[in-house]
Amino acid sequence: MQLNSSSFHPHHFTCDTTRYSEEQVACICEALSNDARKLSQFVWTVLERDEMRNNQYILKAQAFLAFHSNNFKELYRIIESHHFASEHHLPLQEWWLNAHYHEAEKIRGRQLGAVGKYRIRRKYPLPRTIWDGEETSYCFRDKSRVLLRDWYCRNSYPSPREKRELAEKTHLTVTQVSNWFKNRRQRDRAGVPEPKDCLKDISEEEDLKLIRKTASKLSNSFHNPSDLSSYSAAAAAATFPGFYMNYNDMMIGAGTSYQSL
């Protein structure tokens, strides 16, 4: 049954919704996913049916509405109290993480950088209700990275079939491949500089390793810790091109701009 949001009128949702099967309810929820007002009306009408209260599409729709209304406490409650099928995991994972990012940004009064987001993910790991337990690796093997970069240079939007082929070639999961392409496109849209040959791609964990390695080198370079503050950005950049650290305020930067941890 093919449905779209233009097929519905708010008055439809006040009628007898018992005529909708679970499959039809799922289709309607998907069709209304871009119209929060109509989706909300439909969900609360369907919830009058007791058997629909644990319907995964209805629960997912409730989570969607909670996320987009910034009702993060309700979002977390829905996610943590219901086990979702794997087909729903990806959007629920994104809402979970983005909600925690948003809360952290509101408290800090600034946007989170890559390192800040990494720390939030460590602090608020995905619940097992929306995660199959498989570790997500941000440190892919060099061969895998080369294959992904090469493909991205030719096509930044691979099809589902192409993603499966890439997953087999790189020994990654389809989800990891999808996330890699999504993150790379986001970096490009944000204007993060990349070499023309698409060969530069430093992951978040690699950034952290580089930061720790830089800190270790700097601390070993001086007998007097106070000398660290006088160590120039140019000297740090010479050791690790593209990065510098200011130990007075623990700011990390790349190029001509920097962001605080």
Swiss-Prot record:
Coiled coil, from the record: none
One cellular-component annotation, GO: transcription regulator complex
GO biological process per UniProt: regulation of DNA-templated transcription; regulation of transcription by RNA polymerase II
Name of the protein described by the UniProt record: Homeobox protein ceh-33
Main location: nucleus
Lineage of producing organism: Eukaryota, Metazoa, Ecdysozoa, Nematoda, Chromadorea
Gene designation per UniProt: ceh-33
Keyword entries, A-Z: Developmental protein, DNA-binding, Homeobox, Nucleus
Family in the record: Belongs to the SIX/Sine oculis homeobox family.
